């Protein structure tokens, strides 16, 4: 069942499952962006509980990252939890983050989870519309910057490395009229093209298009996929003024931990399915 009705039915009838106990991540290193709260934090906690040797929390605010670190260590004291600053609204910050990652002795898993949902038009300091800058341009740049350590680790270990981009089912729900413009990015930056929630949906479609194109071009045993985390009661919606959203969340939304299960599933399963879009913990064709 597709469309919005199908979405809400699945939210009620499917419950995300945690990783099986036999999934072990011993010795591995992961980077998770947007990891100070919500799904990114929950995914980091779950992977740490499965023996992950090191998790790097990519966060905009270091103090919030340090609080998340302590939360992970309470559960998994043997995990090496590091907090690295990265700002998706600064190309310089993302480049510095990527350069720092080149010094890692290994990088097995990357989950790009940082995102915003701004329903009011706003330009980031880069000059690009904020949803597009953070959700698409920032995510895409980081995926490129982290490819080399992922490839190097796969070559060294003989096992595929994983890059998971957190997308959304809402990517199906946008007409993406900007695609008809001579310059898509320039049109997305114009205020009169902005349609609130539709722009967030478009940014998630751009995630899928980027993931598919990148996956088709990457060699070196790096499996790249995208995941729909589902509707979760997370901080993503904190500035959403939509009437009745709190009521909908109370009825339909999964917990951040359940959304995190979807992320860890995508980052550890379907090793032979590059370019996959995963939803409700299965492969969507």
Swiss-Prot record:
Pathway(s) served: Phytotoxin biosynthesis
- Which keywords, in A-to-Z order, does the entry hold? NADP, Oxidoreductase
What class does this enzyme belong to in the EC scheme? oxidoreductase
Give the EC number(s) under which this enzyme is classified. Answer: 1.1.1.-
Q: Which stretch is the leader sequence?
A: none
One GO molecular function term of this record is: oxidoreductase activity
State whether keyword Secreted applies.
Answer: no
Catalytic residues, per the record, are 168 (proton donor), 200 (proton donor), 204 (lowers pka of active site tyr)
* Annotated positions binding NADP(+): 39, 64, 87, 200, 204, 234
Q: Name one Pfam family in it.
A: adh_short
Q: Tell me its family.
A: Belongs to the short-chain dehydrogenases/reductases (SDR) family.
Q: What does this protein do?
A: Short chain dehydrogenase; part of the gene cluster that mediates the biosynthesis of the phytotoxin solanapyrone, a causal agent of early blight disease of potato and tomato. The prosolanapyrone synthase sol1 is a polyketide synthase that produces the octaketide desmethylprosolanapyrone I via sequential condensations of 7 malonyl-CoA units with one acetyl-CoA unit, and one methylation step. The octaketide backbone is further methylated by the sol2 O-methyltransferase to yield prosolanapyrone I. Prosolanapyrone I is hydroxylated to prosolanapyrone II by the cytochrome P450 monooxygenase sol6.
Q: This chain belongs to which protein, by name?
A: Short chain dehydrogenase sol3
Q: Which organism is it from?
A: Alternaria solani
* Gene field: sol3
């Amino acid at each position: 069942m597709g469309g919005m009705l199908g979405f809400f039915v699945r939210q009620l009838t499917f419950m995300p499952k945690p990783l099986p106990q036999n999934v072990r991540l011993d010795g591995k290193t992961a980077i998770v962006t947007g990891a100070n709260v919500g799904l990114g934090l929950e995914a980091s906690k779950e992977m740490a509980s499965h023996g992950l040797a090191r998790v790097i929390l990519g966060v905009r605010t270091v103090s919030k990252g340090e609080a998340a670190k302590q939360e992970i260590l309470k559960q998994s004291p043997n995990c090496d939890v590091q907090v690295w600053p990265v700002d998706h609204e600064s190309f310089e910050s993302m480049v510095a983050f990527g350069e720092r990652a080149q010094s890692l002795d290994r990088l097995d898993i990357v989950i790009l989870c940082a995102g915003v949902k701004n329903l009011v038009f706003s330009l980031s300091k880069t000059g690009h519309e904020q949803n597009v800058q953070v959700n698409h341009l920032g995510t895409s740049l980081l995926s490129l910057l982290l490819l080399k350590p992922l490839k190097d680790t796969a070559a060294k270990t003989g096992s595929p490395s994983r890059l998971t981009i957190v997308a959304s089912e809402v990517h199906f729900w946008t007409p993406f009229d900007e695609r008809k413009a001579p310059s898509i990015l320039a049109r997305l930056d114009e205020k009169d093209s902005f349609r609130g929630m539709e722009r967030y949906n478009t940014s998630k479609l751009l995630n899928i298009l980027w993931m598919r194109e990148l996956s088709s071009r990457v060699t070196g045993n790096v499996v790249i996929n995208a995941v729909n985390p589902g509707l979760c009661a997370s901080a993503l919606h904190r500035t959403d003024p939509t009437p009745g959203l709190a009521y909908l969340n109370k009825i339909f939304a999964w917990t951040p931990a359940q959304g995190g299960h979807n992320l860890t599933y995508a980052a550890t399963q379907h090793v032979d399915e590059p370019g996959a879009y995963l939803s409700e913990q299965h492969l969507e064709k």
